[in-house]
């Protein structure tokens, strides 16, 4: 094998202090005996486990490899057995052939010794004289022959590298090649080479933001770049789909035809079905690299596609205004949205009313939003109406992803985004896998979260129902009642359409399955003439459905004209129109679908004469009309009062002779002050502070918010999902912020304190603590950590730190507390202790401050533990929360 490329020395001889070409492989797992050109062992010579070597030549005939390897005296050259399980190449088949066969030559560059097929891959060993020396597969196995090729290949490796010439575990020059597209969650991932062998000392940590470059279907290895201190490294990890969370999960959607998946050079890898979703990783050379689902599971193969992807029609999902309904989150959608039902009533009979199981129906884009609006209207109506002996479970949107992010009524939109499954073909009874995109289902029933969660929720309601059980599935727009004719009749009477036979129990329908578990079930298709939102409004669909449901549950329905089912209640006040961008309709009845008789503008004053549910009856010109109370703020309460009550209260509280308006204002604020003082003080007295001050208890949360504003001189406060603002010194405005930035005022609470009203509540909490109390506070915390476990320590005694002046700021204190709590995993116990200890430490001198502080701690614990998984984020949140609490107290 005489040539001018490889040194002409005997096996075992030295070739110099460095190898002829850079090392391109490593010996891993065992040592290799050195041999001569005929394969005979050379005594006393071995290549050790862990040696980085340069492979110069592979003999296909003799199954031996010519290598240069390191010794104490320099690099030696010789042959070893071609043990492919021990010789690990740094390159991972980065050389890719073009579209024509490529001749392979011997070292003389003229004698052809083989051929590489079009698109065939090879491992780059080194480059010489404008040619590339590669190792490739033959009939004898992987990497069993080598030779020179003229074609440089599509890969950019110069030998010893994999993707972009970077060997597994090595540093990526210049940092990440593409933006991070995933995060490691739940557990660390060990770094591996291209064959799946562990690389000692290398791993990708939980929380690391990574760039996934490729996902190999055969070996299920993901090639990733990850942060390692100040550098970025590259290598393979097991494709643990439960640990690799993609940022753009299923963001790419195919169109109406199949899409070919290609390798980097245009070679065929696979295909994506019409409307199938995939996860975008990055873009390169005008193509998109996506990872997609296969029979091995989600995100198990990647490749390039040329199609840009279908554009979604983004829709903001409307939500109901809740005053007397229980929200039940029964699952999470594929894209992470809540799947929610709203319970109204508490009877022994149950009705589950499902809307928008199809985000897109068939008459216009995202028309499922009309079904969701109807669902919201049902909730808002029945939460203030009688339900007889029925419990109503109303689901406004069963497929929120499809409604919000969908793009077709023949795939994702009608179907789910993740999985592209038609939930109304995914139930167990009569299930068939696959199908065309419009009716697509998974390989087995309940294959997506939306259908599985809905199935489990309905089954759970059925299990808890002792009386009658009904299920209604609302759709559009075919104008028919399907399924149970008894239920259908209530809707046929309202809309005038016909009844169809069958339950779809041979096609995976939800109502077919519901019937099989003993429920009465019907699918309602709203009229086919519906072409717009205006048709829904003008057709009074909501009121008709309210009437149908009311008749079904045996109640007294609402007005057939679309008005409220409430009656007018005398109420005199002066109000002002707010939160109106264009105009506010004045309607002839107390209902959204009654006729408009006029319009009001922002800032218009109104004279209110009565209340009717969520509506105010007002004097409008020479007649009367109704306006929604959400758009009116009360400026002056004109409600009549009894003279004897007026006089008695003025004497009782020592207010003297005052006007009726001032009396009403004083009584409102007196109720607030007394309610706060009595309720919270009683909780402290009974030692039940933690049980009573619950951040999920609306009335107490409102109390806390008001207390914070009144007694801590705050401008705004936020509790649960509502804001409280003291923009006016005499009252607090309670309001909600909608996703579009609109503010809806809910109430106005008088807070101007009557001069002679005596209360134990201090005027302000700030500055209330003396240094001695602060010292006792920290002593108590130190004692708790000591008592809970001898092993738990926060480094030093907080009380000593405080007395020595070493905790120079409240931020220092908060950092110490947060770190101690997180490191020792005692969030729940500590927050519970802290709430009670604050009450004990502060009361009885400052009972209200103690109660508010305890409530804040409970809220901190509930929020931190419920919403944060990552300890770093949790610690940061607790630190900020504790600092705010300490600022509040001291």
From Swiss-Prot:
Keywords: Antibiotic, Antimicrobial, Bacteriocin, Plasmid. The keyword Phosphoprotein does not apply. It comes from Clostridium perfringens. Its cofactor is Zn(2+). Residues 815-869 are annotated as: Hydrophobic. One of its GO terms (molecular function) is zinc ion binding. It comes from the Bacteria. The gene is bcn. PROSITE patterns: PEPTIDASE_M14, SH3B. Zn(2+) binds at residues 358, 361, 475. This is Bacteriocin BCN5. The active site is at residue 525. GO terms for biological process: defense response to bacterium; killing of cells of another organism; proteolysis. May function as an ionophore. Induction: By UV irradiation. The keyword Membrane does not apply. Residues 303-549 form the Peptidase M14 domain. Residues 22-84, 179-241, 572-636 form the SH3b domain.
């Amino acid at each position: 094998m005489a040539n001018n490329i490889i040194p002409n020395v005997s096996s075992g001889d030295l070739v110099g202090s460095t190898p002829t070409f850079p090392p391109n492989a490593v010996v891993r797992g065992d040592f290799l005996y050195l041999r001569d050109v005929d394969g005979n062992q050379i005594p006393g010579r071995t290549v050790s486990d862990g040696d980085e070597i340069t492979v110069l030549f592979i003999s296909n005939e003799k199954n031996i490899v010519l290598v240069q390897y390191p010794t104490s005296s320099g690099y030696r050259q010789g042959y070893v057995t071609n043990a492919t399980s021990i010789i690990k190449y740094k390159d991972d088949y980065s050389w890719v052939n073009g579209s024509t066969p490529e001749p392979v030559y011997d070292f003389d560059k003229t004698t052809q010794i083989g051929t590489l097929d079009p698109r065939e891959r090879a491992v780059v060993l080194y480059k010489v004289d404008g040619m590339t020396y590669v190792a490739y597969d033959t009939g004898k196995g992987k990497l069993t022959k080598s030779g020179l090729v003229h074609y440089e290949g599509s890969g950019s490796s110069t030998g010893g590298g994999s993707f972009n010439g970077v060997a597994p575990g090595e540093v990526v020059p210049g940092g990440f090649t593409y933006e991070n597209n995933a995060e490691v969650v739940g557990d660390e991932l060990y770094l591996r080479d291209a064959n799946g062998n562990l690389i000692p000392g290398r791993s990708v940590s939980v929380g690391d933001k990574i760039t996934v470059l490729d996902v190999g279907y055969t070996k299920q290895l993901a090639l990733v770049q990850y942060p390692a201190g100040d550098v970025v490294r590259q290598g393979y990890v097991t494709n643990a789909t439960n640990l690799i969370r993609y940022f753009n999960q299923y963001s790419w959607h195919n169109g109406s035809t199949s899409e070919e998946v290609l390798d980097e050079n245009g070679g065929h890898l696979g295909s994506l079905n019409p409307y199938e979703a995939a996860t975008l990783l990055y873009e390169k050379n005008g193509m998109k690299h996506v990872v997609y689902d296969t029979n091995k599971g989600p995100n198990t193969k990647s490749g390039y596609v040329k199609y840009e992807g279908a554009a979604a029609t983004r829709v903001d999902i409307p939500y109901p205004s809740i005053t007397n309904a229980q929200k039940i989150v029964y699952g999470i959608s594929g894209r992470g949205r809540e799947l929610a039902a709203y319970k109204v009533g508490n009877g022994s009979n149950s009705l589950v009313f499902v809307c928008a199981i199809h985000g897109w129906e068939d008459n216009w884009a995202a028309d499922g939003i009309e079904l969701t609006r109807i669902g919201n209207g049902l909730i808002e109506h029945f939460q203030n109406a009688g339900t007889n002996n029925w419990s109503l479970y109303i689901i406004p949107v069963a497929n929120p992803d499809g409604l919000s992010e969908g793009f077709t009524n023949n795939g994702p939109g009608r179907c789910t985004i993740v999985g592209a499954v038609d939930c109304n073909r995914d139930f167990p009874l009569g299930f068939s896998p696959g199908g065309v995109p419009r009716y697509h289902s998974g390989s087995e029933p309940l294959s997506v979260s939306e259908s599985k969660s809905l199935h489990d929720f309905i089954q759970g309601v059925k299990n808890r129902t002792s009386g009658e059980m009904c299920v209604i599935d609302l759709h559009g727009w075919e104008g028919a009642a399907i399924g149970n004719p008894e239920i259908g009749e209530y809707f046929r009477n309202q809309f005038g359409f016909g009844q169809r036979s069958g339950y779809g129990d041979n096609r995976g329908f939800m109502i077919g399955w519901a019937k099989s578990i003993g429920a009465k079930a019907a699918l309602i298709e709203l009229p086919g003439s519906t072409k717009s939102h205006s048709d829904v409004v003008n057709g009074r669909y909501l009121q008709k459905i309210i009437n149908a449901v009311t008749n079904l549950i045996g109640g007294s329905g609402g007005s057939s004209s679309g008005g409220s089912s409430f009656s007018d209640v005398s109420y005199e006040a002066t109000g002002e129109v707010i939160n109106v961008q264009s105009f506010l309709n004045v309607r002839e009845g107390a209902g959204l679908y009654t006729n408009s008789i006029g319009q009001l503008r922002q800032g218009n004053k109104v004279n209110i004469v009565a209340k009717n549910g969520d509506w105010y009856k007002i004097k409008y010109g020479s007649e009367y009309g109704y306006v929604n109370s959400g758009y009116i703020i009360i400026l002056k309460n004109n409600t009549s009062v009894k003279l004897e009550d007026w006089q008695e209260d003025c004497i009782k509280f020592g207010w003297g002779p005052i006007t009726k308006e001032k009396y009403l204002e004083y009584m409102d604020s007196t109720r607030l002050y007394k309610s706060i003082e009595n309720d919270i003080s009683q909780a402290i007295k009974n030692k039940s502070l933690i049980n009573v001050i619950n951040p999920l208890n609306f009335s107490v949360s409102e109390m806390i918010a008001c207390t914070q504003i009144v007694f801590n001189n705050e401008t705004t406060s936020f509790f649960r999902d509502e804001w409280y603002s003291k923009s006016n010194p005499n009252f607090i405005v309670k309001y909600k912020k909608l996703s579009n930035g609109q503010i809806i005022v809910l109430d106005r609470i008088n807070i101007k304190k009557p001069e002679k009203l005596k209360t134990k509540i201090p005027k302000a909490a700030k500055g209330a603590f003396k240094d001695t109390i602060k010292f006792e506070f920290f002593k108590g915390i130190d004692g708790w950590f000591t008592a809970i476990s001898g092993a738990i320590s926060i480094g030093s005694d907080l009380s000593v730190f405080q007395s020595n002046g070493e905790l120079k700021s409240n931020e220092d204190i908060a950092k110490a507390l947060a770190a101690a709590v997180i490191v020792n995993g005692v969030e729940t116990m500590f927050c519970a202790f802290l709430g009670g200890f604050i009450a004990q430490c502060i009361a009885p001198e400052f009972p209200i401050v103690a109660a508010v502080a305890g409530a804040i701690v409970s809220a901190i614990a509930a929020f931190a533990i419920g919403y944060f998984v990552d300890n770093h984020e949790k610690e940061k949140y607790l630190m900020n929360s504790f600092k705010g609490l300490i600022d509040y107290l001291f």
